Amino acid sequence: MAAAPPIEPAVTTTFPGFKFSPTDIELISYYLKRKMDGLERSVEIIPEVEIYNFEPWDLPDKSIVKSDSEWFFFCARGKKYPHGSQNRRATKIGYWKATGKERNVKSGSEVIGTKRTLVFHIGRAPKGGRTEWLMHEYCMIGVSLDALVICRLRRNTEFQGSTIQKPPQPSLPLDKHVNLRNEAISESIYGWETMVDFYLSSESGQELLSEIAESSQSSQNPQVPSEEDFYADILRDEIVKLDDPAVSGNTLINVPRLQTESNTTRVLPLPDMVDKQMQSLLQKLPLQNDTGEENNISMSNCFIGIYSIKSINRARWDVVVWLLVMIAVLVFYLV
């Protein structure tokens, strides 16, 4: 009597109530171990497929056991580089990205293998878009990196937008669609930098930068006495009174010092126009004056010179205030 032909795995799936749902321990200790030992007929219900040569939505059709939730495959882990340690996980339009840590699978107290979870992303790392396709990769302990593994493919039905099983074919508009979210984030982050760069590249921005650099350099470098400081010291120090007759040698008079609101004295360099005014003022002073009328004229000329210096200081304060306003506007745009 001839022996009955073996029942094909595809035939057994047609019976109602049949469901192929092995546990993690069964996948490693029975199916994967028997496959690596060469016992092909006892594990032929799980086909061997090069998973990374296909997209995840094409793999369910290659499964022997038909299902709507999970599918199982044997797959050899290929290396990304011939002499490297990374596994090849890229497909034509996407890649499988490992999430979380590699977990141990125990049978009792003995570790028999490892389990790793991967998620499929469309695009290229690191800007790929996550999909609803998940995969658990089971590997035995003590085998090489390119050894055979079992892959449990699943589709997360609760994932947003998972009603579309197959995304459209990749093209230039698809790549732009994948990067829309990243472009929106980068636009909000770098928008103010573009505005500041545009302002600083203009003529007014360059002038502002040069003024800030000059002010910082002048605050760091000490003032070197110059010819302009010499006339400022003349107004601050005591001046020989040349208008009065010499009674007991040269008589000195006190000239009011230029002081700021904080009663501190600063050496401010005077422009060339003030130098010319001081020189002309000193030339007009007579050596001796016997009349009180000419004395009053000389003193009035001195006060005119002092008033001119105060006007110069006021103009310098206007420049400082303008510079502070420009810095405040720049900080406002930066914030």
UniProtKB/Swiss-Prot annotation:
Transmembrane region(s): 315-335
Main location: membrane
Induction comment from the UniProt entry of this chain: By glucose. Induced by salt, drought stress and methyl methanesulfonate (MMS) treatment.
Positions of the DNA-binding region: 112-162
One of the protein's GO biological processes: cellular response to glucose stimulus
InterPro entries per UniProt: NAC-dom (IPR003441), NAC_dom_sf (IPR036093)
Topology within the bilayer: Single-pass membrane protein
Residue intervals of the NAC domain: 14-156
Tissue and organ distribution: Expressed in roots, rosette leaves, cauline leaves, shoot apex, stems and flowers.
GO molecular function, a single term: DNA binding
Localization per record: Membrane; Nucleus
GO cellular component, one term: nucleus
Gene3D superfamilies in the cross-refs: NAC domain
Record organism: Arabidopsis thaliana
Annotated protein name in UniProt: NAC domain-containing protein 60
Highest taxon of the lineage: Eukaryota
Function: Transcriptional activator activated by proteolytic cleavage through regulated intramembrane proteolysis (RIP). Transcription factor involved in modulation of abscisic acid (ABA) signaling. Attenuates ABA sensitivity and glucose-induced ABA accumulation. Reduces the expression of ABI4 gene.
Keyword list, A-Z: Activator, DNA-binding, Membrane, Nucleus, Stress response, Transcription, Transcription regulation, Transmembrane, Transmembrane helix
Swiss-Prot/TrEMBL domain comment: The NAC domain includes a DNA binding domain and a dimerization domain.
A Pfam family this chain is assigned to: NAM
Keyword Transmembrane helix: yes
